[in-house]
């Protein structure tokens, strides 16, 4: 039956005059699932579930705000002419890298106030973050955005993907590459990889591995997209940021191994804010 699904309406349902979009539902579902998955790691590390809720909730809230601000900044000519659309986040238009910046800063502040080690907390929630990102890409699918360039329908059929995806890649009279799907699959693989590696890695390295893995996939997928935020006519913002995050992740793992020899993730309980 799923193969017969026709073009999907971005609006899931209405509550009176209020339209509830699939985009928001899917992103919220990804965050909620990520929270439940992170509970196991938090419990093992001795991090109280209320502390986990505070970190995830407030990081998500401020992450959404900075994700929107980031997007608006790089599309400023449009929003300067249409300022009423700036708060219309349900139309899409949030940038994951902007969300990561806001979420990271918020998480660090909460960790500092509550005497938690931010890198240990990062290790706990990194698998949840990348899984939520993978799920969230289906919100882009429902909004018919974040796709690649035009392709023939036969190209999509030869990929052996479900027909409902092919149907919804038909936008404004043309078929497009489902780049949302490429990134979603990459993120889900990253989720499995991080869970497998985490027990073997040292404190902080799961989080830095997340930055590296996600950024590698994002760099290549971004090159296929048609809606990239551009720094110049030839430089895509997300690709530049991805390169920086890869370098930061690799450098931090190497530096901390040689400088501090941090303990393995599996060998420690709750760590305080680093002295």
From Swiss-Prot:
It is an enzyme of class 2 (transferase). Keywords: Cell membrane, Membrane, Transferase, Transmembrane, Transmembrane helix. One of its GO terms (cellular component) is plasma membrane. One of its GO terms (biological process) is lipoprotein biosynthetic process. Its EC number is 2.5.1.145. It is found in: Cell membrane. Its main location: membrane. InterPro entries: Lgt. It comes from the Bacteria. A 1,2-diacyl-sn-glycero-3-phospho-(1'-sn-glycerol) binds at residue 137. It holds the Pfam family LGT. It is a multi-pass membrane protein. The keyword Oxidoreductase does not apply. Pathway: Protein modification; lipoprotein biosynthesis (diacylglyceryl transfer). The chain crosses the membrane at residues 18-38, 55-75, 89-109, 203-223, 235-255. The keyword Ribosomal protein does not apply. Catalyzes the transfer of the diacylglyceryl group from phosphatidylglycerol to the sulfhydryl group of the N-terminal cysteine of a prolipoprotein, the first step in the formation of mature lipoproteins. Belongs to the Lgt family. This is Phosphatidylglycerol--prolipoprotein diacylglyceryl transferase. It comes from Staphylococcus carnosus (strain TM300). The gene is lgt.
């Amino acid at each position: 039956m799923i193969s017969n699904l026709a073009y999907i309406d971005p609006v899931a349902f209405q509550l009176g005059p209020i339209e509830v979009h699939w985009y928001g539902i899917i992103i919220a579902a990804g965050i909620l699932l990520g929270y439940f998955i992170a509970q196991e790691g938090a419990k093992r590390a001795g991090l109280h579930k209320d502390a986990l809720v505070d970190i995830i909730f407030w990081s998500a809230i401020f992450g959404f705000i900075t994700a929107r601000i980031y997007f608006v900044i790089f599309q400023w000519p449009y929003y300067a002419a249409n300022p009423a659309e700036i708060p219309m986040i349900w139309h899409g238009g949030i940038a994951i890298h902007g969300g990561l910046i806001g979420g990271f800063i918020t998480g660090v502040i909460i960790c500092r106030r509550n005497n938690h080690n931010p890198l240990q907390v990062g290790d706990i929630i990194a698998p949840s973050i990348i899984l939520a990102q993978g799920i969230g890409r289906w919100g882009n699918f429902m909004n018919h955005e974040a796709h690649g360039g035009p392709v023939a329908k036969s190209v999509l059929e030869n990929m052996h993907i479900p027909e409902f995806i092919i149907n919804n890649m038909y936008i404004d009279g043309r078929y497009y590459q489902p780049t949302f799907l490429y990134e979603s699959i990459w993120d889900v693989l990253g989720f499995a990889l991080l869970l497998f590696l985490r027990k073997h890695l040292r404190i902080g390295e799961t989080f830095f591995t997340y930055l590296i893995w996600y950024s590698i996939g994002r760099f290549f997928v971004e090159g296929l997209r048609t809606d990239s935020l551009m720094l110049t006519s030839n430089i895509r913002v997300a690709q530049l940021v991805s390169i920086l995050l890869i370098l930061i992740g690799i450098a931090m793992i190497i530096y901390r191994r040689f400088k501090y020899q941090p303990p393995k993730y599996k060998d420690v309980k709750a760590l305080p804010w680093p002295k």
